[in-house]
């Protein structure tokens, strides 16, 4: 008799007729079939549930959950300079980062995410939180030209990034990423050093690019080129580059992105809230540029809900482009799942044999799914995260029946409330 680590019985799978069993072994989907017979360490009754791939949040600053709700209704640069950076200068520490990361991880799991791509400070603390809970993450120190608590010079940032890459390069769930912040906060030399480090270790480069008109004008004034043209001119762009936002790009820049096989992390809700603009995602997709989805930080979104982000991605581009087919439900879901895992180098994002068992089970016993005609469109357009019953990462059950299995939610909430008191005290003096 076959032995499995996990057996999901009688579950629905989009675009397959009837009920199916999913057998998981060593973190992978070993078999999908009818009435699978085998001995399983753990069995889940999937009756009335739909199996989808879990979400990959490809751009966030997860510890900023502790700054959520501050500086509302400000544009990006005012929000950063008047609220976020002063508070980070005061409070960011390994303890702040881990507590914020745990809060963000709880929110992420509850909304179906098993992989996130993070750029922040003290990423060792985020790695510890991820490994404690059992969630995947690509992690990188923000590399800057100006001093912060973690480094004083670009060379020091690079040194910290190198040390982190060396320490975490062979972990099971977390992996290092090189994260120069943006072309307007990193000199050409800093960007080149970051690229050299990423290439040396075979890592992704994760960077903010062309988020606002103001940024584009600043780069043009400083370098005489648009952001993408500037990055191309210094030899930065390559297939291992993940650019967050990419809201303001020209025809020429899009040709460069396609030619260099640059990847994009689209963050529609953050771009809307900060009034940054609307990324030309349908055009990117049409050109064959790989687009992934991200929430950005919880302080600028203001949540980490990837189902909500997926729905916004699909709906907003329809309205903005006056085209109901601009981004359909299936494309939005692929952008939010399969594309992200692929960019991260993880064979997940599909409910298929041989793929990593990063899955969610969505309960159809909700009005949003009654009657059930089209699981994908009803998940993207109708459902909310309360419909997500079970979350599985690399074959490990992180949530079942909406109950978190690997983390104490109430303990994390209590820590968040303590940070609130400290932050409110500081705000009164700003």
Curated annotation (Swiss-Prot):
Keyword Cell membrane: no
Top-tier EC class: hydrolase
Alphabetized InterPro entries for the sequence: Amidohydro-rel, Deaminase_MtaD/DadD, Metal-dep_hydrolase_composite, Metal_Hydrolase, MTA/SAH_deaminase
Cofactors (names): Zn(2+)
Keyword Signal: no
Pfam family, one: Amidohydro_1
GO molecular function, one term: 5'-methylthioadenosine deaminase activity
Co-factor binding comment: Binds 1 zinc ion per subunit.
Organism superkingdom: Bacteria
Residues that coordinate or bind Zn(2+): 59, 61, 208, 296
Keywords: Hydrolase, Metal-binding, Zinc
Assigned EC number: 3.5.4.28, 3.5.4.31
Catalytic activities: S-adenosyl-L-homocysteine + H2O + H(+) = S-inosyl-L-homocysteine + NH4(+); S-methyl-5'-thioadenosine + H2O + H(+) = S-methyl-5'-thioinosine + NH4(+)
Residues annotated as binding substrate: 88, 181, 211, 296
Annotated function: Catalyzes the deamination of 5-methylthioadenosine and S-adenosyl-L-homocysteine into 5-methylthioinosine and S-inosyl-L-homocysteine, respectively. Is also able to deaminate adenosine.
Family per record: Belongs to the metallo-dependent hydrolases superfamily. MTA/SAH deaminase family.
Protein name: 5-methylthioadenosine/S-adenosylhomocysteine deaminase
Organism: Aquifex aeolicus (strain VF5)
